[in-house]
């Protein structure tokens, strides 16, 4: 019977090692999300909403759609496996959008498959601010509950309650996998 020490010595002679002492070529991948990552993702989402509105004002539907496609591809995880997206102003039977096309239609309208979509991002938004109520970070996922205040060019403010859940994709980018939004309850 060979002892553990004898086996280790034999493996060492052969150029092999056992246990935790082997540290050559150690690879550590840390995809942990930080609070700052979440806050930056929310700022970017708000900025993109305003930018799509501006693109619509200056370049029409075509410009807004082109920008919205880029935003969806960079912010959401449709290409990385899927998204649960429940936008603010949707109605049955198309309340939840699990496809990129459904999200695009919600933001800019114009898709006959979604005839009730008017283009939420085309409403003349001039500012957007996410105020966090809570953030939970669990390594490679993070969830936030926020009040998002969106102002249009007339100065009217719409407040929505948002839940965003993020993952880190294979390229190390933060992506939205859950986006639930509803109008703030006013008690009336």
Residue ranges and their predicted role:
Residues 137-145, 154-187:
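Short beta-strand edge/turn micro-motifs at domain boundaries
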Residues 10-12, 22:
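Cleavable N-terminal signal peptides
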Residues 1-10:
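Bacterial N-terminal signal peptides that target proteins for export
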Residues 23-75:
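Short, low-complexity N-terminal intrinsically disordered segments enriched in polar/charged residues
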Residues 59-132:
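A solvent-exposed, acidic/Ser-Thr-rich amphipathic alpha-helical stretch
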């Amino acid at each position: 019977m060979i002892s553990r020490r004898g086996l280790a010595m034999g493996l060492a002679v052969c150029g092999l090692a056992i246990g935790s002492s082997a540290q050559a070529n150690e690879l550590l991948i840390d995809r942990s999300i930080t609070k700052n990552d979440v806050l930056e993702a929310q700022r970017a989402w708000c900025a993109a909403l305003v930018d799509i509105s501006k693109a619509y004002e200056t370049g029409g539907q075509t410009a807004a759609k082109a920008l919205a496609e880029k935003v969806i591809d960079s912010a959401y995880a449709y290409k990385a496996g899927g998204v649960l997206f429940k936008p603010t102003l949707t109605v049955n039977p198309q309340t939840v959008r699990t496809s990129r096309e459904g999200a695009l239609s919600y933001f800019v309208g114009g898709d006959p498959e979604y005839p009730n979509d008017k283009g939420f991002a085309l409403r003349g938004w001039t500012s957007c601010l996410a105020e966090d109520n809570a953030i939970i970070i669990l390594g490679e996922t993070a969830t936030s509950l926020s009040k998002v205040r969106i102002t249009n060019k007339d100065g009217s403010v719409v407040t929505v309650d948002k839940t965003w859940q993020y993952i880190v994709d294979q390229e190390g980018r933060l992506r939205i996998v859950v986006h639930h939004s509803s109008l703030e309850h006013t008690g009336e």
